[in-house]
Amino acid sequence: MSQNQEISKKEQYNLNKLQKRLRRNVGEAIADFNMIEEGDRIMVCLSGGKDSYTMLEILRNLQQSAPINFSLVAVNLDQKQPGFPEHVLPEYLEKLGVEYKIVEENTYGIVKEKIPEGKTTCSLCSRLRRGILYRTATELGATKIALGHHRDDILQTLFLNMFYGGKMKGMPPKLMSDDGKHIVIRPLAYCREKDIQRFADAKAFPIIPCNLCGSQPNLQRQVIADMLRDWDKRYPGRIETMFSAMQNVVPSHLCDTNLFDFKGITHGSEVVNGGDLAFDREEIPLQPAGWQPEEDENQLDELRLNVVEVK
C-alpha cells in the first residue's frame, strides 16, 4: 500500500469517526427535546456557513435510518448583499437532490437605509430575517424550523446575558415562536464548534462568507467567544462542565423568587433535596462533569482501517 493510500484511508477513518460523533450528538438532542416527530416537514435554514451545511448533511444522514418518516426542505434567504454568490447554494442543493427554495428579499437595502453608517446592523437584520423565515415556513407547510446554532453558541449566549443583560438565559434547543405558530429547533445543540469546523473542512462545503453585509461583528459576543476558547485551552473539560450545568439547574440554590418559594420556607416545610449545605464544605469532583478526553485524530486504529462510511 502506498503512503498516499495509507493517508487516504486514515483520513476517511477519521472523517467517519467524526461524522459518527456528530450523528450521535444530533440524535441525542433530537430525542432529549422531541425535536422531530413522525410526518414532520423540516425547513432547514441554510446560510452557506459551516454550521448550516453540517446540520443539513447530518439530518439527511439520519433521515435514511430514522425509525420515523420526516422530510427536509432547505431554505436560503438571499438578502441582496453586494457580492453574494447567488449560484453557489442552488448548484450545491441540486447536486444533492435536496428540495430547496431561495427567498429573495432586499433586507440589505432596508437595513442600510435605517441604520447609520458604522453602527451594528445585526439586530434589525435578524428581526427582518426571522419574519421572512416564519412566513416562508407557513408557505411551505413546514412543521419545524431548524437553525444551525451549536453548543458553543448556546454557552456564549448564556454568558452574554449574564455579563451584559443580568439574566441567566441561554439559547433554547427548542422553542415556540412568539405568535405561537412555529416551532424552532436547534439540532446541533450538543455539537462542539470545533467538530463542526473539522467536518466542514473535510467535506469541503462551498462556504459563503458571513461578512458580505459589511457590518461590524458583535464585539461583546466575540469577547465571550475568546474567553471560552481560552478556558477550553487552559482547562480541558470546563466547557463540557458548564454545558452540563445548564442541564442541571437547582432553583432552590439560586436567588430567583419566581422559580422557588423562599418565603414559604418555615418550620414544618418539606425538606429541600440537597438543601442542607449551609455549613458544609463544597465537594467538587476532580474530573469535570460531562468531560471526555480529547480524541487524538492522529492515532490510527489499525484494526479498523477498513471501516465503511457511516450510513
Curated annotation (Swiss-Prot):
Membrane-spanning ranges: none
Pathway: tRNA modification
Entry annotated with the keyword tRNA processing: yes
Any Pfam family the entry gives: ATP_bind_3
Claim: ATP-binding is one of the keywords in the record: yes
Single Gene Ontology BP annotation: tRNA thio-modification
Catalysed transformations (reactions): cytidine(32) in tRNA + S-sulfanyl-L-cysteinyl-[cysteine desulfurase] + AH2 + ATP = 2-thiocytidine(32) in tRNA + L-cysteinyl-[cysteine desulfurase] + A + AMP + diphosphate + H(+)
Compartments (UniProt record): Cytoplasm
InterPro entries reported in the protein's UniProt record: Rossmann-like_a/b/a_fold, TilS/TtcA_N, tRNA_Cyd_32_2_STrfase, tRNA_thiolation_TtcA_Ctu1
Enzyme kind, highest EC tier: transferase
Binding-site list for [4Fe-4S] cluster: C122, C125, C213
Chain location of the short sequence motif PP-loop motif per the record: 47-52
GO CC entries: cytoplasm
Enzyme Commission number(s) of this protein: 2.8.1.-
Keywords: 4Fe-4S, ATP-binding, Cytoplasm, Iron, Iron-sulfur, Magnesium, Metal-binding, Nucleotide-binding, RNA-binding, Transferase, tRNA processing, tRNA-binding
GO molecular function, one term: sulfurtransferase activity
Needed co-factor(s): Mg(2+); [4Fe-4S] cluster
Cofactor binding summary note: Binds 1 [4Fe-4S] cluster per subunit. The cluster is chelated by three Cys residues, the fourth Fe has a free coordination site that may bind a sulfur atom transferred from the persulfide of IscS.
PANTHER family registered for this protein in UniProt: AMINOTRAN_5 DOMAIN-CONTAINING PROTEIN, SULFURTRANSFERASE-RELATED
NCBIfam families noted in UniProt: PRK10696.1
Protein task: Catalyzes the ATP-dependent 2-thiolation of cytidine in position 32 of tRNA, to form 2-thiocytidine (s(2)C32). The sulfur atoms are provided by the cysteine/cysteine desulfurase (IscS) system.
Protein family per UniProt: Belongs to the TtcA family.
Note: The thiolation reaction likely consists of two steps: a first activation step by ATP to form an adenylated intermediate of the target base of tRNA, and a second nucleophilic substitution step of the sulfur (S) atom supplied by the hydrosulfide attached to the Fe-S cluster.
Known partners and oligomeric status: Homodimer.
Name this protein carries in UniProt: tRNA-cytidine(32) 2-sulfurtransferase
